Amino acid sequence: MILDGNRRWAKSNPTAHDPHGHKAGAGKIIEFLGWCEDAQVKVVTLWLLSTDNFKRSQEEIDALLKIIGETVDELAATGRWNIKAVGAMDLLPAWLQEKLNALKPIRKDGVEVNVAISYGGRREIVDAVKNYMSQEANAGRSLADAATNLTTEDISKFLYTAGQPDPELLIRTSGEQRLGGFLLWQSASSEYYFCEAYWPDFRRVDFLRALRSYSVRQRRFGS
């Protein structure tokens, strides 16, 4: 789920007292996850912060990180979902890293919720290759042997989402029709759905339309 359009929502709602729209966007998340529960969705990945977002003003970044920290606390406090942080944690401030590292599975059932924070698809693949090469070096293998033996399965084992199924459906709000690098490796066979609504205005009916659109498609893997 690419939660896009917060800032444009704020510009179109000047009386909302939310200059960047991030608080309004965060307030939608628990409601959305309830819809996912009702639809029996098993795994959800929410893109909260991209690596490119760090190019914004420090004031906006600090405000956004604070909201993300509060949102993670709220999600964990419900006790309804297993929350996992995925992304380049080293780019985040120490206080947020500590909070995210403290997240532990609390349920054997329920929706698995990935919060993609400081996430970039290219960065994820680079990190996966680095970790694979480090494993091979620790096992005493040469660089040449490690490169020769590298497979797609090896990279998948070191992705941030390792052990989880690839997404079947990717939804982006705000009308933008691009992925921006979201789940770049995992989405090779995913279906896409683009919704015109800004994320804070995203409704249950919009979600159901996305699911309905997906349900009537004939998925063609490998083409």
Question: Which residues are covered by each model-predicted region?
Answer:
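Flexible, compositionally biased loop and terminal segments
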Residues: 1-223
